[in-house]
């Protein structure tokens, strides 16, 4: 006969714990999300980024990585480690969570764009949009070459949280 002393509480805890193991295969299989969202690190837009993505009906259905400059991180030689991270995260998200789409969310008045472009930075209106669009087009072209199976969307967000689709 066993000399172990297990009271009712411990027995109940053991049964709950043992029962929860049956849920693990389902959790392991639930590793698919629709998209990878690549946003800028700017603290001013963290909440706006989340609201925007949730508004696209992606609530709990996307991976997210934040890199200075968002699209700029994917192609600028000014930030080589961010460049590698940009593409590594697409590869990882695709491998682990089988993403189907990449959503890139730049924003206006971006410090990373100011650093990368220096005196050539276009800070307002249509010129700023065109500068972001040119960078986004480079990312889109590279994405089409490296991951032709992934669709993409590119947005430019104002500091008030309103985003416009650029590509």
Predicted regions and their residues:
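Catalytic cores of secreted/periplasmic or lumenal enzymes
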Residues: 2-6, 30-34, 43-47, 84, ...
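Short, conserved "active-site rim" segments that organize catalytic pockets and cofactor/ligand binding
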Residues: 14-18, 30-83, 157-163
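Short HxH-centered metal-ligating active-site micro-motif
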Residues: 60-123
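Residue-level detector of alpha-helical recognition elements and their boundaries
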Residues: 26-27, 52, 119
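N-terminal secretory signal peptides and thylakoid transit peptides that target proteins
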Residues: 2-19, 25
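Histidine-centered active-site/metal-ligand motif
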Residues: 40, 107, 132
């Amino acid at each position: 006969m066993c000399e172990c002393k297990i009271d009712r509480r411990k027995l109940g805890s053991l049964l709950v714990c043992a029962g929860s193991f049956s849920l693990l295969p389902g959790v392991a299989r639930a590793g698919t999300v629709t998209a990878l969202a690549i946003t800028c690190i700017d603290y001013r837009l963290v909440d706006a980024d989340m609201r925007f993505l949730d508004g696209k009906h992606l609530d709990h259905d996307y991976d997210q990585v934040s890199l200075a400059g968002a699209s700029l991180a994917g192609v600028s030689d000014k930030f080589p480690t961010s460049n590698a991270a940009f593409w590594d995260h697409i590869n990882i998200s695709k491998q682990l969570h089988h993403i189907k789409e990449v959503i890139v969310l730049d924003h206006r008045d971006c410090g990373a764009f100011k650093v990368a472009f220096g005196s050539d930075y276009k800070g307002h209106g249509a010129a700023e949009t065109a500068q972001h669009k040119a960078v986004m087009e480079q990312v889109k072209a590279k994405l089409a070459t490296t991951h032709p199976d992934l669709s993409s969307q590119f947005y430019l967000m104002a500091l008030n949280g309103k985003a416009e689709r650029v590509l």
